[in-house]
């Protein structure tokens, strides 16, 4: 049986401030540092080990992975960083407070922007300082690959080539894999693995810093999935994510 571990980064400073983060490269909060170290300790306690790791090019995910691997004494394993694992791009909402945005536009509209499958937030202008085309880490991307906004469908579309071309073949070869990424890039993968409908994906919330284990068959189809850790605390964390976009 194959086990794949998914981990949303620990709480970031902008998670703490309830701001839309997207591709903005903000670091972990003190709580996020603690969450990510605890995730590493929990994975080690539960007997997990890894041969290879994947993460995004954003430091909140990279830092989370470092803390996990340090706690597991696995800092020597190969780590692949790829922009396709970035959080979805929140367009012109990036940096804005979620509750204040809900007060301005209404809870229902913000829920659509945050959680719907195919409705992106308002786009950035390309002359906006927040436009990722100005960032050297994306210099090798084709112009059409650099987003000005994204919905979850866009995130799925840009993530799946990485899954199909790199991650899935590595899992099939017998490598034990951990993916440390973001709420929406992981929602994209969970939607794909579990074949969740466009309507039902709205209700899926992934908490920060809690390992999500997928047990897969040889065709990489899920047999079951579960979070590690205290289930009561887990539900509180999921509810907290769900309530972030409310006025």
Curated annotation (Swiss-Prot):
> GO molecular function terms here?
phosphoglycerate mutase activity
- Please name the GO terms of the biological process aspect recorded for this protein, alphabetically: gluconeogenesis; glycolytic process
Which residues are annotated as active site?
9 (tele-phosphohistidine intermediate), 87 (proton donor/acceptor)
Q: Which Pfam families match?
A: His_Phos_1 (PF00300)
* Key word Isomerase present: yes
Q: According to its UniProt record, which reaction does this protein catalyse? A: (2R)-2-phosphoglycerate = (2R)-3-phosphoglycerate
Alphabetical UniProt keywords:
Gluconeogenesis, Glycolysis, Isomerase
Ranges that cross the membrane: none
> What residues does the record give for site: Transition state stabilizer?
182
Which positions bind substrate?
A: 8-15, 21-22, 60, 87-90, 98, 114-115, 183-184
* Recorded metabolic or biological pathway in which this protein acts: Carbohydrate degradation; glycolysis; pyruvate from D-glyceraldehyde 3-phosphate: step 3/5
Q: Does the keyword Isomerase apply?
A: yes
EC numbers listed for it are: 5.4.2.11
| SMART domains assigned | PGAM
Query: Which family is this sequence assigned to?
Result: Belongs to the phosphoglycerate mutase family. BPG-dependent PGAM subfamily.
Per the entry, what this protein does is: Catalyzes the interconversion of 2-phosphoglycerate and 3-phosphoglycerate.
The molecule here is called 2,3-bisphosphoglycerate-dependent phosphoglycerate mutase
Q: Which gene encodes it?
A: gpmA
